[in-house]
Amino acid sequence: MNKIHAVITGIGGYVPEYKLTNEEISTMVDTSDEWILKRIGIKERRILKPEEGKGITYLALKAIEDLKSRHDFDPLEIDAVLFATATPDYPFPNSASLIAHKVGITNAFGFDMEAACSGFIYALEVAQGFIVSGKHKKVMIIAGDVLSVFIDYSDRNTSPIFGDGCGCALVEATMEDIGLVDSIMRCDGSIPESLHVYGGGSVNPTTYETINNKLHYVWQDGKVVFRHAVSNMADTCQKLISKNNLSKDEIDWVVPHQANLRIIDAVTNHLKISRERVMINIEKYGNTGAASIPLCLCEWESKLHKGDKMIFTAFGAGFTWGATYLKWGYDSH
């Protein structure tokens, strides 16, 4: 019996033009290019400079332009728009609706979803559910963040890590034995204090006090985040590999969330996957949140082949994490 599969048929991405270098960071806090590169693996990150009317939807529209230049599509054929972001333009209206309007997607529904740095793989999970149900045939996923709005550039622990960016993907129905195969998704809200932005929500709405107390900036316990990120990403990847009877040699690519280089190396070392098969671009972009996996796919697209076996894995605030196993959907043009 034929089975409907969900397959990625196109990708796009965009990062702002402005490069915030380690040298510039070192003028703001007590650090150095050498220390940041050694400890985090980042040389520079892209920042969306504050300008009136420009937020994450601006980056998203640029990413969709890139997608359209790589893989032309008809906006009227899109059934749903899923936008994974922790930094929407506004509390409401949702950013997905604004993007759909500007792209000309008029026959679809859309919503924002928030899973922090795990947003892209969570969105893939939702898109797959829509498609294999038979109700929807083409879903646009957008995943991105303007994390610079959460950064206290006087904080040595967080200011070097994060950058801004956005990626997107078309996910379509196919009867071929290709596309998304299996996944494991998890969350754990038992220690939210380890990685958070506590200001601006319904518990701590914006006031002079929340601003003065810096509740609108990201705070993390780096050691706790490192430990949980490595153990949970490695564990879900290993379980997914075993569940699908894969050998390590069969995996063509691992695409990890670009949290920091030490986390990426620790996870792939656990999996015994060689560096040559791991997509890493954190040196150029930093941690771009939900955008990091699709930005890697954009950069490596020309090296991908139809049927390549791939593992995506991510970890983010919440905690949220997971891993996705898929067979790549097309040969690059």
From Swiss-Prot:
SUPFAM superfamilies with a match to the protein in the record: Thiolase-like (SSF53901)
Subcellular location field: Cytoplasm
Highest rank taxon of the organism: Bacteria
Segments of this protein annotated with the region ACP-binding: 258-262
Active site, renumbered: 117, 257, 287
GO terms of biological process kind: fatty acid biosynthetic process; secondary metabolite biosynthetic process
Broad class of enzyme this protein falls into: transferase
Function: Catalyzes the condensation reaction of fatty acid synthesis by the addition to an acyl acceptor of two carbons from malonyl-ACP. Catalyzes the first condensation reaction which initiates fatty acid synthesis and may therefore play a role in governing the total rate of fatty acid production. Possesses both acetoacetyl-ACP synthase and acetyl transacylase activities. Its substrate specificity determines the biosynthesis of branched-chain and/or straight-chain of fatty acids.
Entry domain remark: The last Arg residue of the ACP-binding site is essential for the weak association between ACP/AcpP and FabH.
Protein name (Swiss-Prot/TrEMBL): Beta-ketoacyl-[acyl-carrier-protein] synthase III
Record lineage: Bacteria, Pseudomonadati, Bacteroidota, Bacteroidia, Bacteroidales
